[in-house]
């Protein structure tokens, strides 16, 4: 609903939409605060250093071969996939297809729809994968191929189909990445390892978005998408 509402930015205006979002966020925070119970300070116990907890999770991943390799794949997913998506899709909408906010909102919705469909399917099939790591790598390859086709400036209907499939492949990667992270991490350190997973995915996405912006500024949107797609496929 939020994506569709943002699609009306050209008609409503940016300031009213941001104001509405602030009201909704404040309302959600107030409702969440009222729905949570209160714990006495004495029952919370003594908490250790957050920095020490973070470093212990990083050290565990560093010395665990399978977890380290998994985090490298997750980081590649964020760096080459989501980073490019964050920067390239708005520019592709405006500069290549000469469209506005409603078109971009439709792309966002299509991508998220692909992720939701993939998650529903993976929930049913995740226990049947004998080699989930190979499926994870295959999803990375498939996304690279989708980007290469997208760089050829396809018609609008094919673009949306590619975005849907791209979102589906991204959903597969995220779902399997989380599942493998939970399976491989020791019970005692699971929360810390999951935090490393989040850091690998979204931290690498931030760097990937920055580099994607420089690549697009240097060679153009379509060329940058094709180049990064070929890099992912390799």
Predicted regions and their residues:
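Hydrophobic alpha-helical segments of secondary membrane carriers
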Residues: 1, 73, 196-200
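Conserved extracellular-gate-facing transmembrane-helix segments in secondary transporters
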Residues: 3, 77-86, 170, 205
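C-terminal transmembrane bundle of multi-pass solute transporters/carriers
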Residues: 6, 15-24, 55, 62, ...
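C-terminal membrane-cytosol helix-exit motif in multi-pass small-molecule transporters
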Residues: 23-41
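Short, hydrophobic secondary-structure boundary micro-motifs
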Residues: 34-35, 42-44, 69-71, 88, ...
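Pair of pore-lining "gating" transmembrane helices in MFS-fold secondary transporters
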Residues: 62-83, 164
């Amino acid at each position: 609903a939020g994506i569709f509402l943002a699609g009306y930015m050209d008609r409503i205006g940016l300031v009213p939409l941001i104001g509405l979002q602030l009201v909704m966020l404040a309302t959600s925070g107030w409702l969440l605060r009222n729905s949570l119970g209160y714990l006495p300070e004495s029952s919370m116990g003594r908490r250790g250093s957050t920095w020490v907890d973070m470093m212990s999770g990083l050290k565990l991943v560093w010395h665990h071969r399978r977890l380290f390799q998994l985090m490298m794949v997750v980081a590649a997913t964020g760096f080459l996939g989501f980073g490019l998506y964050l920067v390239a899709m708005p520019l592709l909408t405006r500069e290549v297809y000469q469209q506005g906010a409603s078109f971009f909102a439709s792309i966002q919705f299509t991508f998220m729809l692909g992720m939701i469909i993939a998650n529903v399917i993976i929930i049913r099939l995740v226990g049947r994968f004998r080699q989930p790591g190979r499926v994870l790598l295959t999803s990375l390859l498939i996304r690279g191929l989708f980007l290469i086709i997208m760089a050829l400036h396809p018609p609008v209907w094919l673009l949306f189909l590619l975005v849907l499939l791209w979102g589906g492949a991204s959903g597969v990667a995220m779902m399997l990445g989380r599942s493998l992270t939970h399976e491989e991490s020791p019970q005692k350190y699971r929360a810390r390892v999951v935090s490393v997973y989040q850091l690998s995915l979204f931290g690498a996405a931030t760097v990937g978005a920055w580099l994607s912006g420089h690549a697009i500024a240097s060679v153009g949107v379509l060329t940058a998408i094709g180049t990064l797609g070929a890099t992912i496929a390799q």
